[in-house]
Amino acid sequence: MRLSHFRQADTRFATFLIVSLCALGLLAASPLAAEAQSAGTSAPPSTAAAVTAPEPSIYDRVWRFAEWYRDGSNPVVQRVLFTGRYQQDFAVVGADQGDLNEWNVRRLRLGPRVTMFQKWTVHAEVELNPQERDPFYVRFTDAYVQWAPSTRAAVTVGKQSVPFTMEGATSSKELLAIDRSNLANNMWFPQEYMPGVSVSGRKAPWVYRAGVYSAGAANREFGEFNGGLFTLGVVGYDFAKALGVKEALLSGNYVYQHTDVHNTLTRRLEHVGSVNFKLDTNRWGLRADLSAADGAPGQSGLWGVMAMPFFNLTNAFQVVGRYTFLNSADPNGVLLATYENRVVRGRGDRYNEGYVGANYYFYGQRLKLQTGVQFARMRDEANDGGTYSGAAWTSGLRIGW
């Protein structure tokens, strides 16, 4: 691999990192300045007041822009939120097969979320691409109505996320690594949002989800409804209380897809099974996934494993490691990950990846910087353009509201 390519990108990456850190550092410093000024002009609050009504941080005040309306006494509309995310990447790839160096607005989504009649939610978000004029409007992601009479059951109808596999079930706002692993890229459905009907809920320590979705041809709204259907079943049990930790969720996921040539919202997989585990002790934790899939015509069956430990050095600084392995039964069954795929378009049959990264949280998952280096190798037994050996360095700003 040509690691000299990383040195060529140092200036641009340093600029991105310095500008981001300075801008966010000013925000982080603002509460201290405000507190110092307040301390010099007013008497300190009583202990009781400090406990019951802590002063909101600058981040709390800034993020209030997302709450447009709230009135719990209104019998019709109780809350209106402006939801969304902005995610900016700087990616460098240096591989034996070629190089890549780019800025990328990875995700820009926004829309309203309205709570009505106490138990109903209407949510819609669109994805935009500010880097190009055509198409600036990419698609609807969420467009659904949900009825949730309690935490034990919620019925959702419309275009919604389809959460299975460890990282496929994790919002891009909450990923520990800067991007999902190649296991999710190959065995989850990266379109993520599909039209369908689902029922989900939690009755501690159990969680569950069941849904039926359209897998037809994709378009920017709800799809063409001209292909097959697929079903999803999820059952999980949280061992947190038994282990004395924050979270220890063991989940089983199963997807069955009626394969059809028009199914472009999904991967060409008939059966997908995943057993995944999420452990969080507050100080350290682990994400793990063992998944397997039967291919539809034109796609080999494959299986994979992913393990991702993390350690919280402080309340704001976190280090993450990850190992991913994928293997397909036949040649050309494995795709490369997002930025690697822009260097090598071909497929292979065995993939290994190691990742080391760090995250700095300014305001929890709502405002953070992430960076990570991955070293990956793909074998191409067919020798038809899928071989890959290289390193990728991706850093990014993540904002969610």
Per-range role (PLM):
Residues M1-R12:
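N-terminal secretory signal peptides that target proteins for export/translocation
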Residues G211-E224, V255-H262:
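Active-site-proximal beta-alpha loop/turn segments in soluble metabolic enzymes
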Residues R2-L3, L26-Q87, W401:
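N-terminal periplasmic/intermembrane-space "pro-region" immediately following the signal or transit peptide
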Residues Q8, T15-I18, M306:
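Generic detector of N-terminal low-structure segments
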Residues E67-A218, G227-L232, G236-A242, L249, ...:
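Outer membrane beta-barrel
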Residues A14-A29:
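Bacterial N-terminal signal peptides
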Residues R64-E67, T231-F239, Y355-N359, G396-R398:
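Short, well-ordered amphipathic alpha-helices
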Residues V51-P56, G94-G98, F117, P135, ...:
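Outer-membrane beta-barrel pore domains
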